[in-house]
């Protein structure tokens, strides 16, 4: 457990320090995470990897309904039956994004979502995140890429926080 040294963390309007196990589980279902180096199960197809969160939560029928549209949205329909090692870095990042949003979360946390991809794929991923934001999703992005931040500010970001060694250095729209 991490304990706050100062301030409070509120999670969907509730003090995170006093949430019980059920409330934490409910909050986790409302958050999707796109990891920088997303781990996939190499023996499952990309479609199976993306659907995994629904499958383990007894929502497999929902996965069967939503998966084709989601694969099309991220541009992976043709790669659905491939195994993870067969994908390029950009395809893996799009699969990670699809897996993060398959549960229809309210918040998407993306850790360096464009860190391992070329410029063109970076732009494509940013467009996908922008589309999610326009659907009412909150997008939190952790990145070292100032160019990405500048590009996102005009499309998605309402607020940018600059941190150094865990300390807030700057907050606002100007960077």
Kindly give the residue locations of the regions a language model identified:
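Conserved ABC transporter NBD signature motif
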Residues: 7-15
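ABC ATPase NBD coupling module
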Residues: 16-32, 132
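Short coil-to-helix segment of the ABC ATPase nucleotide-binding domain corresponding to the Q-loop/switch region
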Residues: 44-51
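Conserved signature/switch motifs of ABC ATPase nucleotide-binding domains
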Residues: 82-85, 103, 135
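Conserved ABC ATPase signature
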Residues: 83-87, 91-93
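Hydrophobic anchor residue at the start of the ABC signature
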Residues: 97
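Catalytic Walker B motif of ABC-type/P-loop ATPase nucleotide-binding domains
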Residues: 108-111
């Amino acid at each position: 457990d991490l304990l706050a040294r100062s301030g409070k963390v509120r999670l969907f309007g509730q003090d995170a320090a006093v949430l019980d196990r059920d409330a934490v589980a409910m909050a986790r279902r409302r958050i999707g995470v796109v990891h920088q180096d997303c781990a996939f199960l190499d023996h499952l197809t990309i479609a199976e990897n993306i659907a995994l969160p629904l499958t383990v939560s007894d929502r497999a029928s929902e996965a069967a309904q939503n998966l084709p549209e989601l694969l099309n949205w991220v541009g992976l329909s043709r790669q659905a039956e491939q195994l993870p090692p067969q994908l390029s870095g950009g395809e893996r990042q799009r699969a990670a994004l699809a897996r993060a949003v398959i549960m229809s979360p309210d918040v998407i946390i993306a850790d360096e979502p464009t860190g391992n991809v070329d410029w063109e794929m970076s732009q494509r991923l940013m467009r996908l995140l922008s589309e999610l934001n326009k659907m009412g999703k909150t997008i939190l992005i952790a990145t070292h890429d100032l160019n990405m931040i500048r590009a996102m500010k005009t499309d998605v970001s309402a607020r940018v926080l600059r941190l150094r060694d865990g300390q807030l250095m700057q907050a606002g729209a100007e960077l």
